[in-house]
């Protein structure tokens, strides 16, 4: 009985992910990574000349400003980039 209770507690902790971390897509979207502490935004960077093709994706703490050549899109939910 104690073993069953302990198993349920462990499963609950794993499922709830008590130390929540943001998950951001990598360059190829089916793959993602958990962000480090303090990195609370996902970002997608692409060239303005080719807006449909992302150049880089990942985790970041502050969304960079876009320029004439490069555009950044940031969001704060799991796998949103």
Curated annotation (Swiss-Prot):
GO BP terms: killing of cells of another organism
Keyword Disulfide bond: yes
Disulphide bridges, residue numbers: 24-42, 35-59, 63-74, 75-80
Signal peptide feature range: 1-21
Alphabetized SUPFAM superfamilies for the sequence: Snake toxin-like
A GO molecular function held by the record: toxin activity
Protein family (similarity comment): Belongs to the three-finger toxin family. Short-chain subfamily. Type IA cytotoxin sub-subfamily.
Name recorded for this polypeptide: Cytotoxin 8
Organism: Naja atra (Chinese cobra)
């Amino acid at each position: 009985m104690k073993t069953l209770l302990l198993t349920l507690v462990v499963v609950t902790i794993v499922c709830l992910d008590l130390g929540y971390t943001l998950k951001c897509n990598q360059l190829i979207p089916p793959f993602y990574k958990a962000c480090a502490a303090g990195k609370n935004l996902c970002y997608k960077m692409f060239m303005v000349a080719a807006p449909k093709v992302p150049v880089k994706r990942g985790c970041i703490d502050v969304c960079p400003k876009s320029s004439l050549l490069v555009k950044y899109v940031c969001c704060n939910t799991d796998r949103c980039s």
